[in-house]
Amino acid sequence: MSKKTNAPVQEFEYKAEMKQLLDLIVHSLYTHPEIFLRELVSNAADALSKARFSSLTDGGLMAAAGEDAIHITLDKEKLLFVIEDSGIGMSEDELIANLGTVAKSGTLGFMQSLQEQKKELDGNLIGQFGVGFYSVFMVTENVTVETRSAQEGSEGLRWQSSGQGTYTIEKVEKKERGTRISFTLKEEYKEFAEEYRVEQVIKKYSNFVDFPIYLGEKQLNSVTALWQRPKSELQEGDVHEFYKFISNDFEDPLDYLSVSVEGAVSFKALLFLPQNAPMELLYRQGELENKGPQLYVKKVMIQNECRDLLPEYLRFIAGVVDTEDLSLNVSREVVQSSPVMAKIRQILTTKILGWFEELAVEQPEKFKTFYKAFGPIVKIGLNTDFTNRDKLIELLRFESTKTGEGEFVTLKEYVARMGGEQKEIYYHSGAGRAQLLANPNLEYFQSRGIEVLLLSDPVDVFVIPSIHEYDSKQLKSIEKADIDFSKEKTEGEEPVAENLLVPLLAKFREALGEDIADVVESHRLVSSPVTIVGGKDAMDSQMERMMKMMQQEMPAAKKVLEVNPRHPIIRNLSGMMIANADNPLINSAIRQLYEGALLLEGDLSSTTGFVQRMNELIEAATLSR
């Protein structure tokens, strides 16, 4: 314990945002009380890492009194909890910055939004958003932090707070560098004054901290750099625990990859494929800009999330990359421009894509799990990583009209089962499998057993058309299929006679007016009365919908309505035209057919008129009985 000096005690008031944040954390983390210990250990390890790193580049730092380690002391009777490190310590300005203000902009708003959505603030979020220290206020009423910076000329300081409106800072005598945190546990959390419980939590969350953690004289953790071990020596249990520690994920990884490279550049890496998409994909609209594996130089962490190690479409990969080919005091700018980093990135990308290919062949079910979670992200690489474009194309998987829901086909498999007459690879894009299969434009292909890829990922409409061709076969939307449907023999009912069809199509044009570009006879429909298609040079329907979502003022392109002259409804309309061309039911039926086609496409802007007209038509039909 440090001695108090005669220096005055300074009182500071938390900012309003900080008060709200403290209240939010304390009242939202009650189901995960053990998180406080994980966060305190993590902060202590970070302080030790900073001291170790700084000592290599700054000869004026105060040396540690003993081993670089974390010490925990418990008093079961008094419910006293103490955790101490010999790390970098803090100055007064650092105390105010680190313990008196919100660590990251936007943190409070983010957590409040989760609370409003009735989502629990789990331990992952606490760690990710830099507010881990404050979780200690869940298990105690008051906290004392005694610290001394390792910088030359530093003084001992004591920070105290009850987590309410204020905190105090005063000078104290402290001989050694580092930080000591002490507090009395609340009665309901007295379990954390028990040695077995503390050991349990340390092994669960902090077993691979790069510094020894002592409870009294007993070391609780296993300090080891797993990525330095040969793959043959890695134990799955250890690897999984290491992944959980570095990623703050509670689940085991789906798979992992051990990499050891010697040559123009030398490095070792241990990379992990998560079971599920990371938090950023759920809450930050897919932003992976600042993600990446941890970068170590000679076992010292340089960057926690190094975005320069992998291309953006692979930054969901967690792990550690350790090299001796960079200097320890490398800056962020040097990392970005370093030819060593560029080479490591190139090698890692090749290794990871090879890993995915291996999973697809040797563990297809595991690959399917990966693809469902991360396929949409990987596809982005088609438009950004042209060096590896061919490899990425081979990784693509699609549902199709010949697969079950949740089952996939590759482009290679598709081409292998194409019929001799088929010259193109056909796809259809939309909001989901059920909607895609209900689209009348599929009828021609399904009636002839022609497989069509079903694209339901929003990203598909941007990346798949860019492939253009595979194995000398062009990829074509079914709306753009290079098929002369008029030459195809259509079976079924006799069509409306040509001399009767012409005036009927004219009636369609009159009824729909400016809503449609043209109305023509369809040779592609089998069981539907009408369908809507784009013109030859028009944008794909799903692409048009996506563009509208991004640019709301974008004018809608007029489409062509195709009419199936063999369908009973069209034949009946022709009969009504013969009987009375001015029958108002004809216009109502035409409008209903058109809006029904829009509804199937997902493009009907309002259903009010559609439902009203449907009721009128049903009333007319029931009256005629």
Curated annotation (Swiss-Prot):
Cited Pfam families: HATPase_c_3, HSP90
GO molecular function: ATP binding; ATP hydrolysis activity; ATP-dependent protein folding chaperone; unfolded protein binding
Coiled coil regions in record: none
SUPFAM superfamilies: ATPase domain of HSP90 chaperone/DNA topoisomerase II/histidine kinase, HSP90 C-terminal domain, Ribosomal protein S5 domain 2-like
GO cellular component: cytoplasm
Assembly description: Homodimer.
PANTHER family: HEAT SHOCK PROTEIN 90 FAMILY MEMBER (PTHR11528)
Entry keywords, A to Z: ATP-binding, Chaperone, Cytoplasm, Nucleotide-binding, Stress response
InterPro entries named in the record: HATPase_C_sf (IPR036890), HSP90_C (IPR037196), Hsp90_fam (IPR001404), Hsp90_N (IPR020575), Ribosomal_Su5_D2-typ_SF (IPR020568)
Span list, region B: 333-545
Protein name from the UniProt record: Chaperone protein HtpG
Spans annotated as A: 1-332
Region feature (C): 546-625
Family: Belongs to the heat shock protein 90 family.
NCBIfam families: PRK05218.1
Localization in the cell: Cytoplasm
Function statement: Molecular chaperone. Has ATPase activity.
